[in-house]
Design a protein with these regions (language model features):
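Non-catalytic accessory segments of DNA primases and related replication-initiation nucleases
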Residues: 1-58, 62, 67, 72-76, ...
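Phosphate-handling DNA/RNA-contact segment within nucleic-acid enzymes
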Residues: 63, 69-165
Length: 172
């Protein structure tokens, strides 16, 4: 238990190298980037929420954070994830107006490497549970989008393939 069976090592990377399984999704049509200089006046609540989480202009630009004021994701901060080619492969939608349901994420597979485009695999990575934890950790932090990392997950496979040192900073 807790050990990798080296007899199955070759199979470990099959999913990672399978281009058919590449996930690409669109951001909501109503997405408004908070990176823009000319923003609507009603962005105050979104900025106030991000500020309360310790997220400033630099993080907003780095993580390409936006929000929706209308539609299915209305009243939610949107934090997109980009794969190595720069395509959006997932996003987190977190309420900033007090919805009963804090997160309303897209109906897509969460087995991704969140924002792999920003990861330096030659440096140690810090695994955290959520995207806000990753933003707060800075540097080379990766959210596992939960509290479990499975051996067959794309993130585990990428870490093993790159032989990257890992630090874990999970909620406890």
């Amino acid at each position: 238990q807790g050990r990798l069976d080296l007899n199955e090592f070759e199979d470990l990377f099959k999913e990672l190298n399978n281009e058919e399984e590449k996930q690409q999704i669109d951001l909501p049509e109503e997405f408004i980037s908070l990176c823009n200089k000319d923003l609507p006046m009603d962005t105050t609540d979104a900025f106030r929420y991000l500020s309360s989480r310790g997220i400033g202009r630099r993080e907003i630009l780095k993580w390409k954070i936006g929000y929706c004021k209308e539609g299915r994701y209305a009243g939610r901060i949107i934090i997109p994830s980009f794969d190595m080619e720069g395509d959006c492969n997932y996003f987190i939608a977190r309420s900033f107006v007090g919805h009963q349901r804090r997160y309303l994420n897209p109906p897509a597979n969460r087995d991704i490497v969140f924002n792999e485009l920003m990861i330096d695999w030659d440096e140690p990575v810090v695994l955290v549970e959520g995207v806000f934890d990753a933003i707060a950790a800075g540097g080379n932090a990766i959210p596992i989008l939960g509290s479990t990392l499975r051996e067959r997950s794309r993130l585990f496979q990428a870490i093993a393939m790159h032989d990257t040192p890992v630090y874990m900073a999970l909620d406890g």
